[in-house]
């Protein structure tokens, strides 16, 4: 019982941190005794989250351009590009969210 409560409290803390760091997500949650419910539509959260991640990746790339080339920076740039590709695959894996049923 305490483990469930601790897990729920940890989850709520994470959600509150995300809410604080990314107010543009406009998270709406309801907390009951044993569950946390997101009141936002999943599609809305998905779109906003993808946009935020892409924006953060662009900021990282711009920051990396300010430094001279080094192996560490090249690795960071490579990882940033890989993150973008992974994000694109995430979007494509959910293509059913964007297409009408036939």
From Swiss-Prot:
Organism's domain of life?
Bacteria
Name the UniProt key words of this record, in alphabetical order.
Plasmid
Name recorded for this polypeptide:
Virulence plasmid protein pGP4-D
Origin organism is Chlamydia muridarum (strain MoPn / Nigg)
Upper taxonomic lineage = Bacteria, Pseudomonadati, Chlamydiota, Chlamydiia, Chlamydiales
């Amino acid at each position: 019982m305490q483990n469930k409560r601790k897990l729920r409290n940890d989850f709520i803390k994470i959600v509150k941190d995300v809410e604080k760091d990314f107010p543009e997500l406009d998270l709406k949650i309801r907390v009951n005794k044993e569950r946390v419910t997101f009141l936002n539509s999943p599609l809305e959260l998905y779109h906003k989250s993808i946009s935020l991640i892409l924006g953060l990746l662009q900021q990282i790339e711009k920051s990396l351009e300010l430094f001279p080339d080094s192996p560490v920076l090249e690795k960071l740039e490579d990882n940033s590009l890989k993150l973008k590709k992974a994000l694109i695959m995430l979007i494509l894996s959910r293509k059913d969210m964007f297409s009408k049923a036939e």
